[in-house]
Amino acid sequence: MSFLSVSRLAPKLLNSKNATYFLVAARNASASTTNLKDVLSDLIPKEQSRIKNFKQQYGKTNIGQITVDMVYGGMRGMKGLVYETSVLDPEEGIRFRGYSIPECQKLLPKAPGGEEPLPEGLFWLLVTGQVPTEEQVKWVSKEWAKRAALPSHVVTMLDNFPTNLHPMSQFSAAITALNSESSFARAYSEGVHKTKYWEFVYEDSMDLIAKLPCIAAKIYRNLYREGSSIGAIDSNLDWSHNFTNMLGYSEAQFTELMRLYLTIHSDHEGGNVSAHTSHLVGSALSDPYLSFSAAMNGLAGPLHGLANQEVLVWLTALQKEMGGEVSDERMRDYIWNTLKSGRVVPGYGHAVLRKTDPRYTCQREFALKHLPNDPMFKLVAQLYKIVPNVLLEQGKAKNPWPNVDAHSGVLLQYYGMTEMNYYTVLFGVSRALGVLAQLVWSRALGFPLERPKSMSTDGLMTLVGAKSG
């Protein structure tokens, strides 16, 4: 059994006597190795062999049917991608390499004195399938600190963007400009063998993740802090701590929130716009900078990465109209009026989930601990009591429960980050952890160019025997 397979068993056994044994078994072989690339070098041949054998035995097996509704409906529910780093269960929510968010909060290393998991630990888990040791997480922190400096042309570019250019446009453009530093693009042009592709994609991915907080902080300072300096990276601090320092936030609780935020927004299966875009563009052997920049252009769309802004706008309008504390009955009437006017309650419902998003739950727990009396949080908590019941009464929603976006903006506002246009940049920094971990594996496993078959409406009608016109 491979280490990846063993580690996937562990979450199912967490409540058993054997849980510790399996967790240790999943880590022992590489626990003494802090270099992530060395661990990958050991794992990749085993996973290649496992998948090769699987394809040989089951390559022609049918795994589902495709309906006309699926083709017209954004391919919802269509099984068409292999994505290793996370799986979204409709009832349980996201699992990172088999581990739920509560399990990750419990098992992943934390900063000294901290209570939230370090994103470096989650990245190690996403890449290897193994829960890392504290030493392995420290290695990642130092490695990213070492790689964080931005090339001068990117700094100049960021400093010369007009202030009316959206933060996500700046973010995407700067990432694209980093393509000049791509190890993969250079190696490919020199004729590197395809079995070595993953090594250079790994190097680019590590460099890019290291540099993203610097890009994001530079954008924030230029737009909202009069272009003040982001300062220097401290190699003794973790990735999130350096990020909050560069943003100009020194409160320890905000740094803890950022660790949680960057962890839970990192990955959400492979079919969402940003993950699928990265996978698609990467399949053309575009380097990680180009692939991730394309993903960020998808994330910038209102239907993907702007949802938490829409929640805050709606909450602010609700507060303005309803005043201070609002009775449950008045709140219920307001929600019904929203629905009857043809609008939705932002932050509720999800394309896949059918229960409360565990990413919402862990943010709620953070708020209950650190800001229980904040008026905006109390409003969010009140909505959590009322909205699902109203949506169930209405009878239209497949999922009446809150998602991650129903809460994240409120937490950021509480700690003083009120610039809503910037929130998607934070989302983007986080999402790099998941999609780039998968990009490394896509090249390691030799995934081909993505090229599905498209059809015209007339072609579909002919296929199913329908009359056109």
Curated annotation (Swiss-Prot):
Instruction: Tell me which residues this entry annotates as catalytic.
Output: 304, 350, 405
Question: What gene is this protein a product of?
Answer: cs
Q: Which reaction does it catalyse?
A: oxaloacetate + acetyl-CoA + H2O = citrate + CoA + H(+)
Q: List the PANTHER family hit by this protein, alphabetically.
A: CITRATE SYNTHASE (PTHR11739), CITRATE SYNTHASE, MITOCHONDRIAL (PTHR11739:SF8)
Q: Which family does it belong to?
A: Belongs to the citrate synthase family.
Per the annotation, which location comes first and is thus the protein's main one?
mitochondrion
Q: What is this protein called?
A: Citrate synthase, mitochondrial
Q: According to the entry, what is the taxonomic lineage of the organism?
A: Eukaryota, Metazoa, Chordata, Craniata, Vertebrata
Function field: Key enzyme of the Krebs tricarboxylic acid cycle which catalyzes the synthesis of citrate from acetyl coenzyme A and oxaloacetate.
Q: What is its EC number?
A: 2.3.3.1
The places in or outside the cell where this protein is found are: Mitochondrion matrix
Q: Which GO terms describe its cellular component?
A: mitochondrial matrix
What organism, scientifically named, is this protein from?
Katsuwonus pelamis (Skipjack tuna)
Q: Where is the transit peptide?
A: 1-30
Q: Where does oxaloacetate bind?
A: 359, 431, 451
